[in-house]
From Swiss-Prot:
The lineage of its organism: Bacteria, Pseudomonadati, Pseudomonadota, Gammaproteobacteria, Enterobacterales. It comes from the Bacteria. Signal peptide: none annotated. Missing up to 300 C-terminal residues compared to orthologs. It holds the Pfam family DDE_Tnp_1_assoc. This is Inactive transposase YbfQ. The gene is ybfQ. InterPro entries: Transposase_11-like, YbfD_N.
Length: 84
């Protein structure tokens, strides 16, 4: 699947977080996580490291306006598991 097609699907995923607390878009976090895991990331810190290393690439498909989220944020958002 092309990343642009993947982003079309990710971008319609509902975000149940409290809007006033959101710093990083859900679609950015999901794109980062998927790409990192496909590339061999095995934990939250690996995902963060992947993002820092590949930020220019990720920005071709996502906004990443506030950079890469820290691993605690990635873990918290992905672990919420309210994706339908």
């Amino acid at each position: 699947m092309e990343l642009k097609k993947l982003m079309e699907h990710i971008s319609i995923t509902p975000d149940y977080r409290q809007a006033w607390k959101v710093v990083h878009k859900l679609s950015d976090i999901l794109l980062l996580t998927i790409c990192a895991v496909i590339s061999g990331a095995e934990g939250w810190e690996d995902i963060e490291d992947f993002g820092e290393t590949h930020l220019d690439f990720l920005k071709q498909y996502g906004d990443f306006e506030n950079g890469i989220p820290v691993h605690d944020t990635i873990a918290r958002v992905v672990s919420q598991g309210k994706i339908t």
